[in-house]
Amino acid sequence: MRPFPAVLSDLGAIGFALAGFTFWVLTDTSIKLLGQSGLPAYEMVAFLGMFMAIFLALYGLARGQVQVLLPKRLSLQLGRGCLDMANNVCVVIALRHLTLTLFYILVFMAPLVIALLSAVFLHEGLPWRKGAAIVAGFAGVVVAVHPWGSAREGDWIGYAACGVCVACFSVNMVWSRVLTRTEYPESLAFFSGIVTAAAGFALMAGHAAPLTPLLLGEMFVMGLFCALGTLCFYIAVKHTSAANVSQYHYTQLITGTLVSYLIWRNKPGLFVLLGGVLILASGLYVAASAREVATLTEGN
């Protein structure tokens, strides 16, 4: 018995995508709040992975479907889990140096990078309009960062960490689309937590900062949000195209900006807003183009 219907409608998959990206905003908010405590990034990531794996294991036990957590292609899942580990560490680092709004604007390069990866490795082709949209998107990143100005909303450590996040997430998204043909979404999420926790606790053997009950509670909530977001994301990717999922990535800008203002009273500057508009427009065009291609392919 499968834990989810074998076929989920596009609307249902989109609902899971929206839920997943929202839970990830809450995860990132928790990470940014925890980052103010000075905990090492690897220690935060270790507990993130541990709590995420625990929640998913309890989920499998409650449904009597522990077998869906087991990987079928261990080596491939291990590689994908390492990508998640690197992504999570860089998210922690980036959020210590950037506002939530600027962080999401920069990570919105991911759908554009996915389009480039698909053209190079999957030979999907890159029409000139799509190429122009990608160039416009990267121009938006330059505008948002505005290196020519002195008053910026981040620093180069945050920008570099975001670059690694984008690379890991983009490869992971394409890879996950392939893996979900044989693997359960729960298995991908669970194994990611295991790999992340194992690597994080191994690094903690060298140095671990002391924890308080409050910090443990915050990391517990962080792990819960991440588990829910990751599970929803993989369910969405399994039941609809990557293009459908990636275009809803941009809802994080709305929720992230709102949360950033409510908690830290951060207001995005003019260059950040202009860059965000360029990235948003180019990303939505790329996603819409990919969706049209997918629809035509299915119609044939």
Model-identified regions with their sequence ranges:
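Juxtamembrane C-cap of transmembrane helices in multi-pass membrane transport proteins
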Residues: T22-L39, M44, V89-L98, L106, ...
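Hydrophobic transmembrane alpha-helices of multi-pass small-molecule transport proteins
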Residues: R129-P147, F271-A290
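C-terminal transmembrane-helix exit sites in multi-pass transporters
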Residues: V91-R96, A110-V135, I254-L274
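Transmembrane alpha-helices of multi-pass small-molecule transport proteins
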Residues: G12-A13, S37-A86, A167-N172, F190-G206
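Helix-helix packing/entry segments at the starts of transmembrane helices
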Residues: F103-M109, L179-V195, T230-L262
